[in-house]
């Protein structure tokens, strides 16, 4: 059985917003990852879990994350069916609501320099290449003059 999980990547000005997962995280504790992730609880839908994970932002249609990819993640501890969503933030006001004390914006170059070094979560390590070749590429192409 693969337990469903929701993860939400946040992109702002062509950069990924990442935070520390915390020392008590079951998978990849004390590593860098997206600010929003959650297990899908019994009898909850994936979409409702996305909204709940986003807190107050989950009520706003203009910042609702979009589904990107579903994949299986397995290690010695877990079997997860990961549902990766992405949220492209265009407003500083919204970004201020997302910001956490331990978070920062990362460029693709900064991320590439730290991949494989244990800085990022196992999930993120698997997802970054896909993000880079889809959403980040499109974001940078569309916002080249922004």
Question: What do these predicted regions represent?
Answer:
Residues 1-2, 104:
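Generic structural signal for well-ordered secondary structure
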Residues 28-32, 76-80, 84, 88-146:
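Nudix hydrolase/Nudix homology domain
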Residues 18-19, 35, 56-58, 62, ...:
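Short acidic/polar alpha-helix capping motifs at helix-coil junctions
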